[in-house]
């Protein structure tokens, strides 16, 4: 059995989120929380919330044991990009892309 949690439209670049997701993919849930706690990146805090939600979904909706869970899938997708313009010299404008991410975590119980 598996449980899933999704965070949509997180105001963070998918590239930066993906680096942190690579650290926890395949790990035990307790080990993943420990890794995220000491990872000095902003994405770690958001991913920790999503992981906590996935564990809660597993316990409450599927009645799985939290101590036997591991991160089966962890991936990030591109959300909509907010486009902003920065004024430059000589009347030019420079486009700034503020990227968003859709984070998906799936936890399963070890056999």
Curated annotation (Swiss-Prot):
Q: Which SUPFAM superfamilies match?
A: Ribosomal protein L22
InterPro entries given in the database record: Ribosomal_uL22, Ribosomal_uL22_bac/chlpt-type, Ribosomal_uL22_bac/org-type, Ribosomal_uL22_sf
Taxonomy, superkingdom: Bacteria
Q: Note whether Repeat occurs among the keywords.
A: no
The GO terms this record gives for MF are: rRNA binding; structural constituent of ribosome
Q: Does the keyword Ribonucleoprotein apply?
A: yes
Signal sequence range? none
Spell out the subunit comment: Part of the 50S ribosomal subunit.
What's this chain's function?
This protein binds specifically to 23S rRNA; its binding is stimulated by other ribosomal proteins, e.g. L4, L17, and L20. It is important during the early stages of 50S assembly. It makes multiple contacts with different domains of the 23S rRNA in the assembled 50S subunit and ribosome. The globular domain of the protein is located near the polypeptide exit tunnel on the outside of the subunit, while an extended beta-hairpin is found that lines the wall of the exit tunnel in the center of the 70S ribosome.
Q: Which family does it belong to?
A: Belongs to the universal ribosomal protein uL22 family.
**Protein's recorded name:** Large ribosomal subunit protein uL22
**Annotated organism of origin:** Clostridium perfringens (strain 13 / Type A)
Q: Upper lineage ranks?
A: Bacteria, Bacillati, Bacillota, Clostridia, Eubacteriales
